[in-house]
């Protein structure tokens, strides 16, 4: 197999961001506007901007004091999502074989890149990860032109799907989440919906290439 270039999102794909963010919002504000049992509800959150249930001042204070500020370690403390460790173990093996692996995220914070690199190593076992921090994912993907792109944000995936003619060899995958199911029917043919990053890698046949090397 020729070497591939893989670009993987973090929050909602490998890291459990929403649950941690919700807990910080409630702890800092003393408010509890979320539906009962949200922590174990597989259909939560139903929308991308669920945090609007909290007042704007609360959200602003949390981002400034508990997330963006140096040494708060918000990103470092996030829990991995199910199958995240298996996915990153596979990505590590692919990187050893010479494939290019990039983690692309729109996270914010004074030391967010360092926290993210440490998280990938400490929580998922990925040494020396290549982490790109950018809110302009579309432009980063346009520049990298990867063979596989995986994200959970519908607007990002659909924006790339509209211009899929630019990247005829790129596989675009949307990780299925409750908040990204309002999909434009005419674009569904231009990307693949998967249950996890691991599933995206498996569907691309990348797990079989690693298994062949291990068995030989």
Predicted regions and their residues:
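Substrate-recognition "cap/lid" segment bordering the active-site pocket of phosphatases
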Residues: 106-162
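Short, basic/glycine-rich phosphate-binding loops at helix/coil junctions
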Residues: 53-72, 99
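Short acidic-hydrophobic, aromatic-tinged amphipathic segments that line or gate anion-handling sites
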Residues: 129-135, 188-200
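Active-site neighborhood of HAD-like aspartate-dependent phosphohydrolases
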Residues: 1-62
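Acidic, Mg2+-coordinating phosphoryl-transfer loop and its flanking beta/alpha structural elements
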Residues: 149-195
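Charged phosphate-binding loop/patch that engages nucleotide di/tri-phosphates or the phosphate backbone
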Residues: 93-96, 182, 193-216
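Short, acidic loop-to-helix structural element flanking the phosphoryl-transfer center
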Residues: 69-103, 110-114
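Short, charged, surface-exposed secondary-structure boundary motifs
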Residues: 140-142, 181-188, 203-205
């Amino acid at each position: 197999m020729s070497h591939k270039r893989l670009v993987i999102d973090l929050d909602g794909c490998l890291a459990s961001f929403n649950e941690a963010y919700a807990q910080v919002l409630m702890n800092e504000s003393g408010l509890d506007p979320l539906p009962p049992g949200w922590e174990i509800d597989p259909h939560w959150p139903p929308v991308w901007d669920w945090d609007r249930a909290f007042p704007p001042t609360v959200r602003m204070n949390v981002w400034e004091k508990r997330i963006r500020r140096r040494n708060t370690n918000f990103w470092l403390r996030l829990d991995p999502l199910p199958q995240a460790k298996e996915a990153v173990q596979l990505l590590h093996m692919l990187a050893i074989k010479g494939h290019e692996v990039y983690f692309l995220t729109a996270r914010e914070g004074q030391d967010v890149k360092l926290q993210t690199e440490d998280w990938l190593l400490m929580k998922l076992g990925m040494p020396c990860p290549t982490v790109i921090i950018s809110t302009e994912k579309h432009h980063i993907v346009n520049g990298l032109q990867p063979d596989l792109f995986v994200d959970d944000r519908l607007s990002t995936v659909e924006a790339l799907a509209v211009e899929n003619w630019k990247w005829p060899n790129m596989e675009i995958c949307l990780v299925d989440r409750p908040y990204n199911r309002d999909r434009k029917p005419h674009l569904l043919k231009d990307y693949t919906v998967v249950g996890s990053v691991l599933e995206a890698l498996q569907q691309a046949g990348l797990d079989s290439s690693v298994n062949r090397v291990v068995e030989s």
